[in-house]
Curated annotation (Swiss-Prot):
Taxonomy of the source species: Eukaryota, Metazoa, Chordata, Craniata, Vertebrata
Similarity comment: Belongs to the phospholipase D family.
The species this protein was found in: Bos taurus (Bovine)
EC number: 3.1.16.1, 3.1.4.-
Lumenal compartment residues: 60-490
Gene coding for it: PLD3
Cystine connections: C77-C239, C81-C237, C366-C487
Protein name: 5'-3' exonuclease PLD3
Length: 490
C-alpha cells in the first residue's frame, strides 16, 4: 500500500512580457542581415573567381607540362585568327580575270615586316633574295631585293631577328645572310646532314609570336616572280604562332656548335596540340580545328605529330575527294643508296580510291629538273582509273610556260606547291612527297579542319580547281611538243 502523499503545484516564476522593439529598429536589423548575406555572397564569388583566374593563368603558363590526361582536350584559343592564302604567280602565267586570285607572297611578306614590333623568327632552306647568283640584272629580282632591304631595317629599330638556315653541303651564296648579320640579325646554320642525313627544308616566318607565314616559298627572289608558290599567312593567332615558335626553337637549339638531337626533348619543346588534340580556334569567324606537324620524327618532341602521320590521317579520313598539288611525287627514298621503295603515301591513295571510292586528283609539276622515274609511278597510279573497280584517280602535269629569256633563269619556271585539300581538311606543307623528305629532312605543315563554305579549305579547293582546269595542266599522254621542252615527264 502506497503512503498517502500530499501534492503541491510546482510554481514556475512567470516570464516577464518581452518588450517590443520599435519598427524602425526591426527594419534596420533586417537590412543589416540582408547586407551581410550579400557581402558573404560577393566574397564567395570573388574567391571562386580568383581561383579560376589563377588556374587559367597557371595553365596558360605551364599547360605544356603534361597536365592533361590522354582524353582531356586543351582549352580553346580565343584569338580572332585570320587565315589568308598567298601565292606567287610567275610572270607570264596568266589566268582569266574571273579566276580565283590571292594576295602575292611578296605583298604578304612586306606587310609582315612592316608590322613587326618585337621579334621575327625565320626557318629557311637557303637565301638568294638578290640575283647575284645569276650574275645578271634581272628586273624581276626587284621584289626579292626589296624584301632583303626591309629585313635589314628590323634589328636597328629594335626587332629581334633570328634566322635558322640549312648548312649548305657545298658552295652557296651567303651575301644575304652576311648583310643581315651586319644589320644585327642572329643567324644559325643547322647541320641536318650530320644530324639526320637531310636538309632543313622548312619555310616559315613567325612575327611577334602573333602572326606567321608557312608555305612553299624559299628565301629566293625567284620564289616571288619566277616560281609558282602557295602558302598561308595567319594573322592575330598567337596560340598557333607560339606553337610554331616551339618548332623554330628546336632548329635554333640544333644550330648551336656541336649540338645533337636529344634522346628526349626537354619539356619546353613539348606541345599539347596534335592530331589527337587539335587546337580549337575561331578562323575567319568560323570554328576550326588546327595543329602543326613536323618532320623528321627525331625532331618531334612529346605531343608533336610527325608530318607523315598527319598527311596520312588526312588521306585516310577523306570520304569524297583528295586534291594534291606537289612538285615531286615519288614513292621511293629519293636519296637512298641502295635504292629503296617507300609506298606509304602511295598505298594510302590507292586504298582511298579502291576501298572508299574517293576521287583522287594529283597535279604534279613538270620542268627541266623533274626526275624521269616519276613518270612510271604516276602512270601506275593513273592506271587504277577503271569502270569495273570504280576507282577514280587522275594525274596531270602542270607546266609553267617560259619565253627564251625566262628559260635562261636557273631553277625557275616551276609549280613549287606542296598542299592537299579534301572535303574535310586542309594540309599546307613545305616538303616534296618522297620518303626522304619525311624521314630525314626537316619540314613543317599546317593542318586545318573546318566546315562550311568560304573558309580556308574551300579557298584552297578553288585554287586547285583553277589550276587543274587551266591550259597549263596536261594529261600524262599529252604530246611532248605541245608543251615545249621544259617538261621531262612526257
Amino acid at each position: 500500500m502506497k503512503p498517502k502523499l500530499m501534492y503541491q503545484e510546482l510554481k514556475v516564476p512567470a516570464e516577464e512580457p518581452a518588450s517590443e522593439l520599435p519598427m524602425n529598429e526591426i527594419e534596420a536589423w533586417k537590412a543589416a542581415e540582408k547586407k551581410a548575406r550579400w557581402v558573404l555572397l560577393v566574397l564567395i564569388l570573388a574567391v571562386v573567381g580568383f581561383g579560376a583566374l589563377m588556374t587559367q593563368l597557371f595553365l596558360w603558363e605551364y599547360g605544356d607540362l603534361h597536365l592533361f590526361g590522354p582524353n582531356q582536350r586543351p582549352a580553346p584559343c580565343y584569338d580572332p585568327c585570320e587565315a589568308v592564302l598567298v601565292e606567287s604567280i610567275p610572270e607570264g602565267l596568266d589566268f582569266p580575270n574571273a579566276s580565283t586570285s590571292n594576295p602575292s607572297t611578296s605583298q604578304a611578306w612586306l606587310g609582315l615586316l612592316a608590322g613587326a614590333h618585337s621579334s621575327l623568327d625565320i626557318a629557311s632552306f637557303y637565301w638568294t633574295l638578290t640575283n647575284n647568283d645569276t650574275h645578271t640584272q634581272e628586273a624581276s629580282a626587284q621584289q626579292g631585293e626589296e624584301v632583303l632591304r626591309q629585313l635589314q631595317t628590323l634589328a636597328p629599330r629594335g626587332v629581334k631577328v633570328r634566322i635558322a638556315v640549312s648548312k649548305p653541303n657545298g658552295p652557296q651564296p651567303q651575301a644575304d645572310l652576311q648583310a643581315l648579320l651586319q644589320s644585327g640579325a642572329q643567324v644559325r646554320m643547322v647541320d641536318m646532314q650530320k644530324l639526320t642525313h637531310g636538309v632543313l627544308h622548312t619555310k616559315f616566318w613567325v612575327v611577334d609570336q602573333t602572326h606567321f607565314y608557312l608555305g612553299s616559298a624559299n628565301m629566293d627572289w625567284r620564289s616571288l616572280t619566277q616560281v609558282k608558290e602557295l602558302g598561308v599567312v595567319m594573322y592575330n593567332c598567337s596560340c598557333l604562332a607560339r606553337d610554331l615558335t616551339k618548332i623554330f626553337e628546336a632548329y635554333w637549339f640544333l644550330g648551336q656548335a656541336g649540338s645533337s638531337i636529344p634522346s628526349t626533348w626537354p619539356r619546353p619543346y613539348d606541345t599539347r596540340y596534335n592530331q589527337e588534340t587539335p587546337m580549337e580556334i575561331c578562323l575567319n569567324g568560323t570554328p576550326a580545328l588546327a595543329y602543326l606537324a613536323s618532320a623528321p620524327p627525331p625532331l618531334c618532341p612529346s605531343g608533336r605529330t610527325p608530318d607523315l602521320k598527319a598527311l596520312l590521317n588526312v588521306v585516310d579520313n577523306a570520304r569524297s575527294f583528295i586534291y594534291i598539288a606537289v612538285m615531286n611525287y615519288l614513292p621511293i627514298m629519293e636519296f637512298s643508296h641502295p635504292r629503296r621503295f617507300w609506298p606509304a603515301i602511295d598505298d594510302g591513295l590507292r586504298r582511298a580510291a579502291y576501298e572508299r571510292g574517293v576521287k583522287v586528283r594529283l597535279l604534279i609539276s613538270c620542268w627541266g629538273h623533274s626526275d624521269p622515274s616519276m613518270r612510271a609511278f604516276l602512270l601506275s597510279l593513273a592506271a587504277l582509273r577503271d569502270n569495273h573497280t570504280h576507282s577514280d584517280i587522275q594525274v596531270k602535269l602542270f607546266v609553267v610556260p617560259a619565253d627564251d629569256a625566262q628559260a635562261r633563269i636557273p631553277y625557275a619556271r616551276v609549280n613549287h606547291n606542296k598542299y592537299m585539300v579534301t572535303e574535310r581538311a586542309t594540309y599546307i606543307g613545305t616538303s616534296n612527297w618522297s620518303g626522304s623528305y619525311f624521314t630525314e629532312t626537316a619540314g613543317t605543315s599546317l593542318l586545318v579542319t573546318q566546315n562550311g563554305r568560304g573558309g580556308l579549305r574551300s579557298q584552297l579547293e578553288a585554287v586547285f580547281l583553277r589550276d587543274w582546269d587551266s591550259p597549263y595542266s596536261h594529261d600524262l599522254d599529252a604530246a611532248a611538243d605541245s608543251v615545249g621542252n621544259a617538261c621531262r615527264l612526257l
